Amino acid sequence: MKSIIAPLVAVALSTSGLGSAAFGQNADTVLLNGKIVTLDAAMPTAEALAVRDGKIVAVGTSADVRAFAGAGTRMIDLEGRTVVPGLIDSHMHAIRAALFYATEVNWIGTSSIPAAMERIKAAAQRSKPGQWIIVAGGWTEQQFREKRRPTQAELLAAAPDNPVYVQLFYSAALLTPAAYKALNITTDADVPPSGKIERAADGTPTGWIIGDNPTISGLFDKLPLPTFDESVEVTRQFFRELNRLGITGVSDPGGFNLTAPSYQPLFKLWQDGALTVRVVYSLFAQRRGKELEDYQTVTQMLPMGFGDDWLRFNGIGENVAWGMYNNDNPTEAQKEQLYQIYKWAASRRMTITQHWNNNRSVHHLLDVLERVDRETPIAPLRWSIAHLNDASPESLGRMKTLGVGWLMQNAMYFNGEAFLKARGNEAMRLAPPIMTALKLGIPIGGGTDAHRVMSYNPFVSLQWMVDGKTVGGTPTRDEEQLPTREEALRFYTLGSAWFTFDDERRGSLKAGKLADLAVLTRDYLTTPTGDIGATEALLTMVGGRIVYAAGPYAQFEEKRPAPP
């Protein structure tokens, strides 16, 4: 009889959220007396949870979970603080952002040009003369009281002895004279394709270079790279910065300026067991016209899903074919090329994420997807479209039928005023149509598209989701398109995990799942909406390891020794 009863008790404990770990082994860590937002329908909130061997073994009341503690268990009193599942950015260019983290200045949270210049000045004071200072994006003039871009004179006053490069999205960059000299730019002929030096009415250069994606990416390519050892260290630092904001995972869609060596610092941290963020990455298109050939070659050595829980290859995108990248009027030949790539990917059961900005042209992409789907059902592959802020009900309906998900970022937080001016209020009030997509049952992943376009701060993105306001405070979306706080949090956790086939392993807090979580500085569910963006983590755990801790929990951060 004993052999029958024990399994039944284990099942009962597991379904109650307490797991089967009560038999014989103590938890490594127990968190007590908190407000735990689990996103588990069976137990939406809890007071405590226990962790062992990197996984959650119990979730429930403090009294129940305390039973999992024993000799050697680390006990953490949450003192009523809110805990959420670890945040997962479903579309962040984290690998690239990490490489320049040490030399970059961010303007996140600055509300005036003098405040932004103070950050430049502080960077100059801690830098050697001649050392580069870079603002690689993540800002807009709408965040400043002045509602304008900074000037070259303002940069010079803040950093007279350093070359300074300030990027505005992928449309413009401001350089100081020292930066122009270092990059050997004196005339328009020296500017990468499609770009030009902006000049005032009297012909005097303003310091700004105006262009498009190839222009600005070409400029960035000219900036000096850190050494390999420096890149490893700054990647470690950048991931800790993400941990400070409760981020435990990212999906990286490749990007401009990324070459094979760009991935080596990430791989080094992985090999050393020193990653603190789970990274899932995809392969950006390489040679124009040779995209399919390149995918076929690379994936013979790097198959779909290769890696582990910390670093894993997850297919191709976000640029799948150069001829279809930001192309609203593709030729039949370009559509055929995309079809051949998608057809091959479907035959290999490979995931794809596709960059697409405008609803007016997304029918070209959907036509290709439907053609592939008639031959090989694509819903099981969890393909996705990224961006598409103005998606129409018709486009969303076609996505739903195909089983294609939507990777949504807070572009309208930074670009809302410009979108409103260009498209008008009727389009703005539905940009993006979050609740329309949710009610259709389309999988949605939350993210930022950081860091050249937006800030990597997930709480800024979450605040924008629920209040619909731009960085300048302009209301945009209709109330009917505003998700609840829990819905928004779900996009950033379980929603993002779905796209990497991880929703059964992470994204919510329940027994058996990976112990990825964040203890927050404020109650995400009840703090004033306008304060959500100021939220940070006091403690971040990934796989049971406390990778970031501050304030009352600083003692718990686990420092991994540097490799020999």
Predicted regions, residues:
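Phosphate/diphosphate-binding loops
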Residues: 274-308, 382-393, 419-444
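Divalent metal-binding segments
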Residues: 26-32, 41-297, 310-357, 361, ...
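His/Asp/Glu-enriched, well-ordered alpha-helical/loop segment
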Residues: 343-353, 360-383, 393-397, 408-530, ...
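Bacterial N-terminal signal peptides
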Residues: 6-17
